[in-house]
């Protein structure tokens, strides 16, 4: 979650622009629920019992101390904001992350995508808006090591310690249909595509499709 706060100033800048909203513009805050998926790259990581602890290994070799790396998936939570400067043109920012950690061989990981976009809305009417998004951002994979520590046999705690991160630049594009269900409240099914050069270091492809449903509130007249 700390990574989200790093980009809080950008969302604050959008918030400061709310007073400028009028009948030809508007400001949205939204939250998304969805998933992003890509396969495993087929590599492995040695366990602490391996002759090469936490080193790269081949699961196909049949070594019981070599754990395969996973595919990317699971639940993603999103936070975003959009500012429509004109009826058909605007800017926005999004961050999508896994709220909980998942296993990555003997490690754990949490994935984050963030992007800053230009928005083109060829359809922008009272009850519906078609959004076409395109921009740049980053992808961050944070790794940690979980360990159980016990005092005697009565008290045990699960300790998770960060062991590193992998950061990549990304290109982002997306399309969504924003449906206003009650005055300023909306629902937006959205499909996103992230192209992350170097992402094959962690997963099986540099191409990451994502599907989400966003809900939010819009300031400004519809």
Predicted regions and their residues:
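Positively charged n-region of N-terminal signal peptides that target proteins for export
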Residues: 1-4
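Polyanion-binding surface elements
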Residues: 176
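Bacterial N-terminal signal peptides
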Residues: 8-17
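Gram-negative (and chloroplast) outer-membrane scaffold detector with strong preference
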Residues: 24-26, 33-39, 75-157, 168-171, ...
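Sec/Tat signal peptide C-region and signal peptidase I cleavage site
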Residues: 18-23
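C-terminal/domain-terminus segments
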Residues: 192-210, 214
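Surface-exposed strand-loop-strand hairpins of Gram-negative outer-membrane beta-barrel proteins
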Residues: 36-77, 166
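Extracellular loop and loop/strand-boundary signature of outer-membrane beta-barrel proteins
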Residues: 62-67, 101-107, 119, 156-163, ...
């Amino acid at each position: 979650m700390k990574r989200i706060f790093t980009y809080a100033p950008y969302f604050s800048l959008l918030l400061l622009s709310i007073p400028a909203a009028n009948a030809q513009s508007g400001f949205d805050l939204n939250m998304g629920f969805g998933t992003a998926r890509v396969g495993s790259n087929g590599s492995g990581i040695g366990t602490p019992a391996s002759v090469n602890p936490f080193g790269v290994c081949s699961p196909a070799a049949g070594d019981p101390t070599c754990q395969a790396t996973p595919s990317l998936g699971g639940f993603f939570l999103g936070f975003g904001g959009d500012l429509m400067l004109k009826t058909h043109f605007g800017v926005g920012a999004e961050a999508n992350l896994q709220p909980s950690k998942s296993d990555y061989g003997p490690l754990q990981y949490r994935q984050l995508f963030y992007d800053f976009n230009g928005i083109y809305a060829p359809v922008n009417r009272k009850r519906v808006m078609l959004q076409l998004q395109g921009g740049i951002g980053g992808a961050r994979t944070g790794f940690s090591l979980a360990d159980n520590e016990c005092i005697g046999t009565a008290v045990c705690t699960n300790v998770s310690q960060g062991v590193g991160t992998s950061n990549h630049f990304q290109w982002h594009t997306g399309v969504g249909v924003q449906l206003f269900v009650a005055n300023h409240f909306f629902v937006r099914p959205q499909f996103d595509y992230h192209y992350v050069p170097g992402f094959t270091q962690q997963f099986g492809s540099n191409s990451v499709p994502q599907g989400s449903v966003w809900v939010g509130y819009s300031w400004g007249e519809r």
